[in-house]
């Protein structure tokens, strides 16, 4: 019967891949969460998903806490398993979904780290461009800040997705949703510099693809590769923050008065609530400036 648990899990992962067109990275994550739960079921001698109930899930939740998992990690598991059981219910393989009775764990909302405009410009100017990889890093972070790109979108960007004349990118976002995003002349100049010189030099070792950003061997950068570059560059500038150019992009647009719906479209957010995180940041910034600059506020601080 154990094979039945695994087999149904495999069917679900195929459904995500071929019908929902989820990314490989997302499918691998779902696979890990489901396997972890199947291991728990095996320990409890459960051989049928229909035997999973609310009390059992409370026990599973306790086990997750005993493993010292963060609440965000626990919520990630619950979300994946809730979706899996919804699939089983839809396919009439189970009678109900007990995960609907389990609430997500409350977490303290942490606003994304960002840099003020002057800081962001300083960071970009601090990037060394003495060699091909430095030019690549400069072009990549300039573009990420210019267009608010995710790391995965940088990875998937290909030469024919870039219109240098119109300064427009065709971005292949989450859930296979495409969008067009503009970029400015400064980012274009660095992009041209990188594509015509640094990338050409790096691609001598590998000419079999059209991906824009490559490693020292000419192979396309991976998600981890882009994340490492961003982390290395930003931590060199400010080791106290986990900075992403995308967060500063959104914050700076909203601070300058951009319409939130437009920012939502540029970021490729499905839900407006996700974009609204950045309005909280701008409110904090406005309050900070107010407390510092308003004469009455200064009086109170001095007294």
Short names for language-model regions:
Residues 1-303:
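Conserved catalytic core of the tyrosine transesterase superfamily
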């Amino acid at each position: 019967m154990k094979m039945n648990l695994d087999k149904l899990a495999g069917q679900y992962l195929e459904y995500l891949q071929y019908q929902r067109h989820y990314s490989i990275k997302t499918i691998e994550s779902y696979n890990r969460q489901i396997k972890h739960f199947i291991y728990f079921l095996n320990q409890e001698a459960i051989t049928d998903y229909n035997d999973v109930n609310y009390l059992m899930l409370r026990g599973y939740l306790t086990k997750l806490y005993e493993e010292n998992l963060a609440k965000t990690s626990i919520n990630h598991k619950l979300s994946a398993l809730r979706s899996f059981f919804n699939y089983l219910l839809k396919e009439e393989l189970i009678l109900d979904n007990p995960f609907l009775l389990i609430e997500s764990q409350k977490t303290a909302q942490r606003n994304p780290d960002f840099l003020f405009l002057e800081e962001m410009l300083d960071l970009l100017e601090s990037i060394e461009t003495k060699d091909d990889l430095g030019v690549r890093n400069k072009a990549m972070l300039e573009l990420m800040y210019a267009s608010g790109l995710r790391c995965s979108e940088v990875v998937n960007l290909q030469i024919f997705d870039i219109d240098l004349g119109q300064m427009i990118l065709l971005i292949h976002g989450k859930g296979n949703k495409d969008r067009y995003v503009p970029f400015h002349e400064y980012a274009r100049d660095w992009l041209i510099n990188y594509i015509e010189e640094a990338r050409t030099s790096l691609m001598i070792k590998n000419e079999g693809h059209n991906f824009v950003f490559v490693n020292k061997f000419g192979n396309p950068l991976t998600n981890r590769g882009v994340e490492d570059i961003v982390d290395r560059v930003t931590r060199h500038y400010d080791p106290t923050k986990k900075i992403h150019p995308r967060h500063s992009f959104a914050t700076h647009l909203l601070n300058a008065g951009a319409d939130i719906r437009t920012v939502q479209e540029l970021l490729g957010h499905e839900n407006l609530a996700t974009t609204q995180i950045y309005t909280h940041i701008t409110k904090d910034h406005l309050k900070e400036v107010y407390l510092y600059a308003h004469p009455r506020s200064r009086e109170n601080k001095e007294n």
